[in-house]
Amino acid sequence: SVIFVPPKFAKAAVIDAIDAKMPLVVVITEGIPVHDSAFFYAYSLQKGTTQIIGPNCPGLISPEQSNVGIIPADITKRGPIGLVSKSGTLTYQMMYELRDIGFSTAVGIGGDPVIGTTHIDCLRAFQDDPDTTAIVMIGEIGGDAEERAAAFISEYVTKPVVGYVAGF
């Protein structure tokens, strides 16, 4: 399920998707109240059937295979890089810059205070993915998600990782 509704309807739309046992819900909507995001994220954990990506994210793409969200498919190709990013704009920019190398999967997780899928979730998936040989991780200032991801990388990730934290 892909959620494109206005912020005031997003909570109900995500709950409907979780109740329908959708395995993946990508929440593109920006401006969702933090309380609503916290509620539907906790609800998804309680139900245990749905993985949430976002909110306030561009989605995810495995070039030449699938695209869920608003990531333009024509800026990249299939390749060995796994990309996880909080920033939609930097997701697109990185995909464009590395277009000649290509991506196994790129995931825009969103930069809101409460998100579903995290850097660590994606790092774990890329580590386990035989089609991914290197990882690019893009973060933003605020919070400690990038620090937790760095600790996870040092302990569990054997593939090369390039990290960038935007902002100052």
Where are these predicted regions, by residue range?
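Catalytic-core regions of core metabolic enzymes
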Residues: 2-168
